[in-house]
Design a protein with these regions (language model features):
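Cytosolic C-terminal regulatory domains/tails of membrane transporters and channels
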Residues: 410-528
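Transmembrane helical cores of multi-pass secondary ion antiporters/exchangers
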Residues: 1-419, 430, 479, 499-528
């Protein structure tokens, strides 16, 4: 079977598994990885080999750009301290812990042990986004975990690059490594912001939504390739900082509403396809990885995998329950007080360290030979241990995070979010009424002006009542639900009437599509 047919089968399997996961209300990465694992052992179906550059260059730029684009700079700033400590401190701590364990308990050379530690240290942004998107977690927890996963890939990959170079060349300088770490990471962050600012004139001049969408995808790849291949800084951090900058400026630089709606829809579909393919492909790699492990018994491999997984979990738990005790010291040093997380939140974040595509790509990218021509020590074992860590964290954490959230009685701050939303809508409505009074209404009938004013005044009254009630009252929620159901029924009847007119040949397809688009937009607005 050719690669194209295999790819089509995998896409179909990914869509089916994602639907099953949605039906069972579990994070879909779990089903996709397990499904890929099963598909990998189907006789006659060739396993698609993933070159590491495919993950780094094809998958990561759009996925990181999407995650950063929809992140909140305000929330990331508010939780900058824990995110920075996790993205740098926890990555280095985990790398050292893994290296220590595999060196002394598995007898792997120090330099190679640090390579494995650097591979497994960063959490995966794709997995974090995919899992937390479906779970109702407090915004503080979601912001910290997603911010950590966005930033720590850059830290982990820079450390990985240094560790691999030390193994291949046999030379290592801690001062050169530290300087390289700062230049590569800081250079990537700075480059992303500079490129985001530099392409602003391009976005302002684009008025075609199709071109806008195509360029929004292309620029994510350009940023990554320019960072990695030309300037040799962190492409991951460059794309993240670029995505954050774009997300902040986008509503102003491209004011066309229909283009923004199409852009978001395009990215949602693209991200779903890329995530689905990525998790299925991860699961499919085990068969080829096992081929190079003939010198180890099954019990040895399982024991080594369990040791590495336990070290990952313990390092994260130790960090989350020890480092926060240093907050008073950081408060004095930074002259800024940060409110410490509750123990329930720390327990949840300790259990949220999923590994994924970035770790697998890094393991696959380990060179086969050293500079002298000899084989890279324990490369096959590194691949196996990396795969097992990815599988264990995705499946075990993915299946148990939901029950853990319920057991800890952690809830998302829906009421606070609702109040913030109502306050924002209220401010917009007041601005519209103020502008309405300033506009020249000579060309607009007085009756239409009054109807518009009454609509805005009714919105203001409802928003103020909701804010006073602290979000949404039960009566308001019931009446809103009833009104939405009532309005959906009317839209359904409208749609049927339009289709009947089309079926009778009384309206052109183009006119029918325009009317249906308006009805679809109105119905989608009811969904929130």
């Amino acid at each position: 079977m050719h690669a194209i047919e295999s790819l089509i089968i995998l896409l179909g399997a990914a869509a089916l598994l994602a639907q099953v996961a949605r039906f069972l209300n579990v994070p879909y990465p779990v089903f996709l990885v397990l499904g890929g694992l099963a598909i990998g052992f189907v006789p006659g179906l060739p396993a698609l080999q993933i070159p590491p550059e495919v993950i780094f260059v094809v998958f990561l730029p759009p996925l990181l750009n999407y995650a950063a684009f929809f992140s909140s700079p305000r929330e990331l700033r508010a939780h900058f301290r824990p995110i920075a400590l996790l993205a740098i401190g926890l990555v280095l701590f985990t790398m050292v812990a893994i290296a220590f364990v595999v060196h002394y308990l598995i007898d792997i050379p120090w330099a190679v042990a640090f390579v494995l530690g650097a591979i497994l240290a960063p959490t995966d942004p794709v997995a974090a986004q995919a899992v937390f998107r479906r779970l109702g977690v407090p915004s503080r927890v979601g912001t910290i975990i997603e911010g950590e996963s966005l930033a720590n890939d850059g830290t982990g990959l820079v450390a990985y690059r240094i560790a691999v170079a030390a193994v291949v060349t046999g030379a290592f300088s801690i001062w050169e490594a530290g300087l390289d770490f700062l230049l590569v990471g800081g250079g990537g962050l700075l480059l992303g912001v500079i490129l985001g600012w530099a392409v602003l004139p391009l976005w302002v001049r684009v008025r075609d939504s199709s071109i806008f969408i195509a360029l929004s995808l292309l620029t994510a790849y350009v940023v990554y390739v320019l960072a990695e291949e030309v300037l040799h800084v962190s492409g991951v951090l460059a794309v993240v900082s670029y995505g954050l900058y774009r997300g902040w400026r986008d509503p102003r630089i491209f004011p066309d509403a229909s283009a923004r709606i199409r852009n978001i829809s395009f990215w949602q579909v693209l991200v779903f396809l890329l995530e689905s393919m990525l998790f299925v492909l991860i699961g499919q790699q085990l068969r080829s990885i096992l081929d190079g492990l003939g010198e180890y018994s099954a019990w040895e491999l399982l024991l080594y995998a369990a040791l590495v997984y336990a070290t990952l979990i313990m390092a994260r738990f130790v960090w989350f329950f020890i480092v926060p005790s240093l907050n008073p010291v950081f408060d004095r040093l930074l002259r800024n007080r940060y409110v410490q997380s509750q123990w329930q939140e720390r327990l949840l974040m300790s259990w949220s360290g999923m590994r994924g595509a970035v770790s697998l790509a890094a393991a696959l990218a380990v060179p086969a030979t050293l500079s002298g021509g000899s084989s890279f020590p324990e490369r096959d074992l590194i691949l196996f241990l990396t795969f097992c860590a990815i599988l264990a964290t995705l499946v075990l954490q993915g299946l148990t995070l939901g029950p853990l959230i319920s057991a800890l009685r952690l809830k998302s701050e829906d009421e606070a979010d609702k109040v913030e939303e109502l306050e924002t809508r209220l401010e917009g409505a007041h601005a519209a009424v103020k502008r309405l009074e300033q506009l020249d209404g000579e060309l607009v009938p007085t009756s239409a002006q009054e109807r518009t004013r009454e609509q805005y005044e009714e919105r203001i009254r409802r928003y103020e009542a909701g804010i006073e009630a602290g979000g949404t009252t039960e009566e308001y929620a019931q009446s809103s639900a009833a009104w939405r159901a009532w309005r959906r029924e009317l839209i359904k009847v409208e749609r049927e009437a339009v289709l009947s007119k089309r079926d009778r040949g009384e309206v052109s397809p183009e006119v029918m599509r325009r009317v249906m688009r308006d009805l679809d937009l109105e119905e989608s607005r009811l969904e929130g």
